[in-house]
Amino acid sequence: GEAVAIASDQVPELSGGEISKFFGQECLSMSLLWKLQNKTKAKVHSMVCIRGPKGNDFKLIFSPQLEMPHTIKEGVDTMNKELEKCIMLAPEQYAWEYKKYRRAGNEYHYNKRIL
């Protein structure tokens, strides 16, 4: 009866992730979820919290159990696709707290000074 919650949009250290697409753009994504599930055989679900129209009520939405693939790369791809689905339930509420695309060899778009 125990649970672990992982913020799957965090950017890992280079050794802790795989390059995967997120909204069509390559990024380094954590492999921790796949590694934990592969080791423990735990059930995996996504969860999203949607703020209600008045701003003082919230709805938690859990996905059906996710089938985790046999390889790390496929597991990371599955996690990113599921995260995209969660975000698209209310994209205006998603807070881009992490610089998701900074470690994938993409042009660096963060911390540029605006004149």
Predicted segments, located by residue:
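Non-catalytic C-terminal accessory region of glycerolipid acyltransferases
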Residues: 1-115
